[in-house]
Amino acid sequence: MPKPVIAIVGRPNVGKSTIFNRIVGERVSIVEDIPGITRDRIYSAGEWLNHEFNIIDTGGIDIGDEPFLTQIRQQAEVAIDEADVIIFMTNGRDGVTAADEEVAKILYRSKKPIVLAVNKVDNPEMRSDIYDFYSLGFGEPFPISGTHGLGLGDLLDEAANHFPKIEEEAYDDETIRFSLIGRPNVGKSSLVNALLGQERVIVSNIAGTTRDAVDTPYSKDDQDYVIIDTAGMRKKGKVYESTEKYSVLRALRAIERSDVVLVVLDGEEGIIEQDKKIAGYAHDSGRAVIIVVNKWDAVKKDEKTMKAFEENIRAHFQFLDYAPIVFLSAKTKKRTQTLLPVINEVNESHSIRVQTNVLNDVIMDAVAMNPTPTHNGSRLKIFYATQVAVKPPTFVVFVNDTELMHFSYERFLKNRLREAFGFVGTPIHIIARARD
């Protein structure tokens, strides 16, 4: 189930970023910061009491016509579109302004739950000034102070009351759910259409558990699939394609509901830094991963080109050394038929469960081949191992001292497990635990 999304929206200079930093920095324990955009403090993930959520800080909405103000307004509207709950931020010192009323009009159209926050209410005497904000039409205003951190608990409690209820997904365990992620214009939608047009067996379009998600089920060779995508990722136009930071949120939502993630690259344009960041999201999720090089038809090539491109991928994506690479062209449909078998393979690997006795035979053979490391005269001793989870395969290795498990030896053990059991396209987790 994807995490709920809160967007903080308001005119300039009402303290949105201050409240954002308060929420993610103090009153909420951070779960993770999204790489590549945290330096702008745009988007973070955290939890409040028993609720995990993602939170977006937007630029101030301004009614001016200057190009940069228009872009800020467009980006804020994208954030509103993504949000499950909107915190409408105002400034208690200024009272209700014409700009607040303009923001309110935008929020009315969103049809989203709105929590009205009146910032800069820094002492109890100022609370009597908040009642004018009822005129905005969003019910009870919540007085808060970004400077002193006052009132944030009540504000987040109210926001959490509007989080979507958890729904059960309507797909059985045998259905493989996969998503396509990548920067704009790498051909994700074209690849979806190539797959669906090729198979001609679309069952229906089913709205997913999130408002934006569109699940497209289809079947091939008695195997059911669901392509998980978001409507926003397929839209064309400057508003969506110019707001790259918010496309990250759509990708994360799709990843969270997937068994397999396809990281789509542009073979014609090559690899850029944003590709690495997006691939990092897939790796960190623990899902099975396939790297897809699209637009291969447009690449001038000889017998060495594919190998050279693959080596370049491995050099840039060292953390995805387990992910198979598929070269294809959505436009010409060349090699698209090779994709589903690879999806099947990595999905199966993602769910492999190894018998404990077989696992320990492999671990002990590995130790015999490469003795465990020592540190300050103490040697790591491995007693036994057991698998505790699948999706991804996760193993607990019981040892005498967890500090002696060097990352390089852990990597060696992972490589031996891959050699023994395959694990194509799936990360492996090893947890060292001291034996009682």
Curated annotation (Swiss-Prot):
Protein residues bound to GTP 1: 10-17, 57-61, 119-122
Keyword tags: GTP-binding, Nucleotide-binding, Repeat, Ribosome biogenesis
Domain EngA-type G: 4-167, 176-351
Superkingdom of source: Bacteria
UniProt keyword annotation of GTP-binding present: yes
Binding site for GTP 2: 182-189, 229-233, 294-297
Any one GO molecular function term: ribosome binding
Keyword GTP-binding attributed: yes
GO biological process: ribosome biogenesis
Residue stretches making up the KH-like domain: 352-436
SUPFAM superfamilies given in the database record: P-loop containing nucleoside triphosphate hydrolases (SSF52540)
Biological role: GTPase that plays an essential role in the late steps of ribosome biogenesis.
Protein family (similarity comment): Belongs to the TRAFAC class TrmE-Era-EngA-EngB-Septin-like GTPase superfamily. EngA (Der) GTPase family.
Oligomer and partners: Associates with the 50S ribosomal subunit.
Protein name, UniProt field: GTPase Der
Source organism (scientific name): Bacillus cereus (strain G9842)
Organism lineage string: Bacteria, Bacillati, Bacillota, Bacilli, Bacillales
